[in-house]
Amino acid sequence: MGIDLTSKTKITVVGSGYVGMSLAVLLAQHNNVVVLDVDPARIEKINNSQSTVADTEIEAFLAEKELNLTATLDKHAAYEGASFVLVATPTDYNAISNRFDTSSVDSVVADAQEINSDALVVIKSTIPVGHTKSLQEKYATDRVIFSPEFLREGRALKDNFH
């Protein structure tokens, strides 16, 4: 599947915490970005050009830049036609089980595969070693990859730029 660089690419960002918001704002300068989240209050904030996180650069971008950014609770609207699905959902570490809870990532990958298997799914969430390979094998695809993030809370947009 080739990407048409003459028109704006649709990118879906799943999750609107520090990682998701910084990616969404950065990419919405030159692409059509849809944020998918489970929290209606966060969706409303994004659709009103307000940040869901405390980050002065993100807040400034939302206030001052012309961004192609919308948010939705509807996974079909978010995934249909997207070239990329960026996964920025929580994977909290459970000290008792000594594991990351990857259920939100797994759910996003399952939904993306069902609704738009052509999209390249890029996992930004923290996951254990080997998890991406197990997802690739489960769905018989090479369109699920991992790209680690190294962002500081409150400086996430700046960290993405640099």
Where does each model-flagged region fall?
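Redox-cofactor binding/interface segments in oxidoreductases and associated redox assembly factors
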Residues: 85-87, 123
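A structured beta-alpha segment of the ubiquitous adenosine-cofactor-binding alpha/beta core
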Residues: 58-83
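Conserved beta-strand segments of alpha/beta enzyme cores
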Residues: 32, 68-70, 143
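Short, well-ordered alpha-helix to beta-strand connector turns
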Residues: 31, 81-82, 141
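Dinucleotide-binding Rossmann-like beta1-alpha1 core, especially the glycine-rich loop
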Residues: 156-162
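N-terminal FAD cofactor-binding segment of flavoenzymes
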Residues: 54
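NAD(P)+-binding Rossmann beta1-loop-alpha1 motif at the extreme N-terminus of oxidoreductases
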Residues: 2-50
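Rossmann-like NAD(P)(H) cofactor-binding subdomain of soluble oxidoreductases
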Residues: 93-155
